[in-house]
């Protein structure tokens, strides 16, 4: 009996030629995909350590030429870098937290049938996706409400995003209604159900919204140009943009 089991394990553990071919094919495909994903980062890196004139003329292809590290020395010795890095980190962290809360909490409210006018307010928020306020109206609005040339001009305008709201609402609607009904029978109120039931079950979509918000906050530098004038409010991306312009 033991011998048969051992032979069965050996037989199961062996791979046929077809299995090996499939494994090799999958490995090659994923290897190529990995190279495609990594190459942009590699290309950027070799450009940073190559001769600037060669980079500007497009003569750098696969390998660096005229290797030097002056670009890194220049960036790391900038006095504007530490405060700009702090501003970028602060806006990314705070902006992401506020955005996640502002997307998930109203989304949960919009899924509740007992609230009057929920469909109207939901459509009112969603319809803003199809219209742009324009640069001048936004500038005047920010100055009127007092956030122009302040740190909060990075946070407040991006708190409520219709796209994130739609994502959260769609996901929350897919959760089993019986879970919330059971919590309601046990005496859980609206806030208790939101914080102790909905949020834990919505971790996947909250992570997605967090990534979208964090990447958007970190990469955005145009609002620094348009809505701030103090150097203390400059973000890391704006400082790097200025360095890039100066090197051209």
For each predicted feature, which ranges?
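A hydrophobic, multi-pass inner-membrane permease signature
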Residues: 2-247
């Amino acid at each position: 009996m033991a011998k048969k089991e051992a032979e069965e394990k050996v037989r199961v553990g062996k791979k046929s030629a077809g299995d090996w071919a499939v494994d090799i094919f999958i490995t090659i495909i994923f290897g190529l995909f990995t190279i495609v994903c990594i190459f942009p980062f590699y290309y950027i890196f070799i450009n940073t350590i190559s001769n600037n004139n060669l980079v500007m003329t497009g003569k750098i292809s696969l390998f660096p030429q005229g290797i030097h590290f002056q670009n890194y020395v220049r960036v790391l010795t900038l006095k504007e870098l530490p405060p700009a890095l702090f501003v970028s980190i602060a806006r990314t962290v705070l902006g992401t937290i506020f955005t996640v809360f502002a997307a998930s909490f109203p989304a949960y409210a919009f899924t509740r049938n007992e609230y009057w006018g929920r469909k109207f307010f939901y459509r009112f928020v969603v319809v803003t996706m199809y219209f742009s306020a324009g640069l001048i109206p936004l500038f005047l609005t920010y100055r009127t409400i007092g956030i122009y040339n302040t740190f909060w001009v990075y946070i407040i305008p991006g708190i409520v995003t219709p796209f994130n709201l739609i994502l959260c609402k769609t996901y929350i609607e897919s959760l089993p209604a019986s879970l919330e009904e059971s919590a309601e029978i046990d005496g859980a109120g609206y806030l208790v159900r939101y914080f102790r039931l909905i949020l834990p079950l919505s971790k996947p979509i909250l992570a997605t919204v967090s990534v979208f918000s964090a990447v958007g906050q970190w990469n955005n530098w145009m609002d620094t140009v348009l809505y701030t004038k103090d150097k203390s409010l400059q973000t890391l991306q704006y400082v790097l943009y200025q360095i890039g312009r100066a090197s051209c």
